Curated annotation (Swiss-Prot):
The gene is hprK. Both phosphorylation and phosphorolysis are carried out by the same active site and suggest a common mechanism for both reactions. Catalyzes the ATP- as well as the pyrophosphate-dependent phosphorylation of a specific serine residue in HPr, a phosphocarrier protein of the phosphoenolpyruvate-dependent sugar phosphotransferase system (PTS). HprK/P also catalyzes the pyrophosphate-producing, inorganic phosphate-dependent dephosphorylation (phosphorolysis) of seryl-phosphorylated HPr (P-Ser-HPr). Homohexamer. Keywords: ATP-binding, Kinase, Magnesium, Metal-binding, Multifunctional enzyme, Nucleotide-binding, Serine/threonine-protein kinase, Transferase. It catalyses: [HPr protein]-L-serine + ATP = [HPr protein]-O-phospho-L-serine + ADP + H(+); [HPr protein]-O-phospho-L-serine + phosphate + H(+) = [HPr protein]-L-serine + diphosphate. It is an enzyme of class 2 (transferase). Its EC number is 2.7.11.-, 2.7.4.-. This is HPr kinase/phosphorylase. GO terms for molecular function: ATP binding; magnesium ion binding; phosphorelay sensor kinase activity; protein serine/threonine kinase activity; protein serine/threonine/tyrosine kinase activity. Belongs to the HPrK/P family. It comes from Burkholderia cenocepacia (strain HI2424). Pfam families: Hpr_kinase_C, Hpr_kinase_N. InterPro entries: HPr(Ser)_kin/Pase (IPR003755), Hpr_kin/Pase_C (IPR011104), Hpr_kin/Pase_Hpr_N (IPR011126), P-loop_NTPase (IPR027417), Ser_kin/Pase_Hpr-like_N_sf (IPR028979). It comes from the Bacteria.
Amino acid sequence: MDTSSINAQSIFDDNAATLKLSWLTGHEGWERGFSADTVGNATSSADLVGHLNLIHPNRIQVLGEAEIDYYQRQTDEDRSRHMAELIALEPPFLVVAGGAAAPPELVLRCTRSSTPLFTTPMSAAAVIDSLRLYMSRILAPRATLHGVFLDILGMGVLLTGDSGLGKSELGLELISRGHGLVADDAVDFVRLGPDFVEGRCPPLLQNLLEVRGLGLLDIKTIFGETAVRRKMKLKLIVQLVRRPDGEFQRLPLESQTVDVLGLPISKVTIQVAAGRNLAVLVEAAVRNTILQLRGIDTLRDFMDRQRLAMQDPDSQFPGKLV
């Protein structure tokens, strides 16, 4: 990932209001940030932000009341040595939290080395938690996919397929049935955790749905506030096809998945044909996926019944004609 745009200035601008940050000194170092190696070697955002640590270089160092108190109890020689080691690590910036006064020697060294120094009245723990969440978001893997992203029965569903198959019309039908629109045409996905991908709408396309013959529709204005969603976790991909290809299976023996940002996402394929109620089919696919997530697999249950019937043809099953 390109980390050139992530620097002290951008982080300060994005978090100044939330964390009540003040830029004390080191303004010349506004371009300081993380190296690509540092980000690549980090297993999580916890490796990029933390309490004062002289072992891990190139990380955001937060000095709370405990660190300042420890500093005050050191001898002048130890204070000078610790401050020199801290600045030598070349952190993107330093934060003095908890409303504590920044030590004069720290301010002086930050000024001389152009190391940004922020202060905040918030506790060190709160600052670290907030910055870790922020870093995990901006450094998370991202992708933009084409389709209509909807909230159907509380599940994030992406409608995909070739142009002209009626994805937007299907989305409009589902919205009229009480489901919610997240994004149309271009959907921004980001992997925020080890087991989920979140989808949002680009700001330019917020609340808009393009339908051929009608143009752009403002779904929020037409259907109301409850017809749109800010974000949803992607759980199912519904691919619309005009006609089955050679790989299309009417009764697939294994669940289909699509890799999205390194995670396997469940997928179903629905053929578009005259007379087919696609909205009902999509809702049924969503309900079936919900059952599968709960451990209920209808196809596997049927195969188990079939296997038992083949092993014992004379066995009695509910509903068997005799």
